[in-house]
Amino acid sequence: MKKIIAILLAVLFVTALAACGSKTAETAPAATQAPAAEQKQETYTSSQGTVDGFDPNQKTEFAMNTSEEVRTFNIGEVDPSLFEAPILVTSFGQSADTSMMDAIMKRSGVKDYAFNALAKDTDIKNYKTVIIVCGASSKGLGAAGISEADETARAEKIMAAINETNPAVIMCHLGGSMRRGVLSDKLTDMVLEVAKYMVVVEDANFDGKFTTVAQEKNIPLTYLYAIKDGMDVFSALFNK
């Protein structure tokens, strides 16, 4: 009889422990860290909207001319007299890089310029210099409420207006390799057809694209090690 009672007590004890463990598992707070794939999606903005042609995780080794010690590097010589006020800063691709360009202009002390990321073709006639910041962002396009097709059409209309009124055009590519891709490159190539100067954060040149264009089209090019290095470049260009 004592053995039976002992066995029953042991069974009850084990059952109680199992129930307690199950309750703890049910009430334990969920982990706050998302899976790696979800984290990458939140922190990575596609360089070209919904169809990605550049893998940000694929590292490409290439020799850079800029560094921590050498902040800028020039190919060719820019003529500041070509770039007169009034100046327009706009975007092809609606990336946050355009707002960074606005900050550069302000901190460089440039006075007579307007910032309008969504400028229209009808605005172009009012400016002697147009700075176009190239680099598409799905997040930026979504925030602006426009599609890739809409942005491409806007860019094409602006380019038609530029060909009519002939302002001096500066192509800026400030987002580095993350702003390379099918749509980003398509928008950039539009601007390179008429650009008189290029300013590029150098790690976007992983395939030699911008160096090749500069040499083939004889367009002055300044490489930046980081976006902030653009302040000295644009201060020298416009505060003459």
Predicted features by range, described:
Residues 1-9:
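Positively charged n-region of N-terminal signal peptides that target proteins for export
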Residues 8-16:
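Bacterial N-terminal signal peptides
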Residues 16-34:
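Bacterial lipoprotein signal-peptidase II cleavage site
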Residues 29-88:
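N-terminal low-complexity, Pro/Thr/Ser-rich intrinsically disordered segments
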Residues 80-108:
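Short, charged N-terminal beta->alpha structural module
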Residues 105-126:
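A short, well-structured beta->alpha microelement
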Residues 142-165, 214-221:
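A short, gly/pro- and small-residue-rich
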Residues 181-212:
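Structural recognition of alpha->loop->beta junctions
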